[in-house]
Amino acid sequence: CIRDSGTDGYCDREGALALKGMIADYPAEGVHFIDSGNYHYLTKFWTDKLETPFSLIVFDHHPDMQPPLFDNILSCGSWVKDILDHNNNCKKVIIVGSSDKLIQAVPKGYERQVRFYSETTLMHEEGWQNFSSGHINGPVYISIDKDVLNPASAATNWDQGSLSLWELEKLLAVILQKEQVVGIDICGECSTTLNL
């Protein structure tokens, strides 16, 4: 991704065409590694390939539901909102591990479509019980930004959450045991860890 202009953090029309071309021959089903969190919007391109209704579970310190800053250009901070606004197959979004402060800044009007398990909620046993008792009817796509993890568990190029790697593994185990997972992507690589 890094070598394509128009794609770092924001994805202009030409960048979108180039990236969609790069993934055209690959199905949404499977596990996809995406690079840094600056490219988390690639989840939108993967989920746009799903032809049946699905729910999206996002592990991210940031809800990624900001309105676009520039002429409806997709960004790493707006892609979840874009999916909700434009992908009719996405029936529900569950965002796990986001900052309470950032959740409060999410635009109004998405309450019926989005459920949050904030990092504060997951600090309490009741939050874990609520997460574990939930069930989604239908296919699930999982998107993980490693910035949901605490700095002891991962190094990323964004401010980070408070989940430990062990906690993320436990939450994923709940989903994998109960749900029909159709695809997974993982982002959050840090340029310093990539030696760039």
Residue ranges and their predicted role:
Residues R3-L196:
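Conserved alpha-helical scaffold segments that buttress catalytic/binding sites
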